[in-house]
């Protein structure tokens, strides 16, 4: 039987306050810190920082 995968599902939420988010996976062993990445927010219609939050 295979072991559990090392990747967690995470939600990247916009810091612009629009409520828009992306979902992705992250390797929890190699990158234990919170992810922050610049991505396009279609509601704000510009590139903004997206911060990692847990999927509820």
UniProtKB/Swiss-Prot annotation:
Q: Which InterPro entries match?
A: Ribosomal_bL33, Ribosomal_bL33_CS, Ribosomal_bL33_sf, Ribosomal_zn-bd
| Compositional bias ranges of the Basic and acidic residues kind | 1-12
Q: Where is this region: Disordered?
A: 1-30
Write one Gene Ontology MF term.
Answer: structural constituent of ribosome
Give the top-rank taxon of the lineage listed in the UniProt record for this protein: Bacteria
What UniProt keywords are attached to this protein's entry?
Answer: Ribonucleoprotein, Ribosomal protein
Positions with biased composition (Polar residues): 15-25
Any one Gene Ontology BP term: translation
One Pfam family assigned to this protein is: Ribosomal_L33
Q: Name one GO cellular component term.
A: cytosolic large ribosomal subunit
* Gene3D superfamilies per UniProt: Ribosomal protein L33
- Does Disulfide bond count among this protein's keywords? no
What family name appears in the similarity comment?
Belongs to the bacterial ribosomal protein bL33 family.
The name under which this protein is listed is: Large ribosomal subunit protein bL33
Identify the species of origin: Ralstonia nicotianae (strain ATCC BAA-1114 / GMI1000) (Ralstonia solanacearum)
Gene encoding this polypeptide? Answer: rpmG
């Amino acid at each position: 039987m295979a072991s559990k995968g090392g990747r967690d599902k995470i939600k990247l939420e916009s810091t612009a306050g629009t409520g828009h988010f992306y979902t992705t996976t992250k390797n929890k062993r190699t990158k234990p810190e919170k992810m922050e990445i610049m991505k396009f927010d279609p509601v704000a219609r510009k590139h903004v920082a997206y911060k990692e939050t847990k999927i509820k």
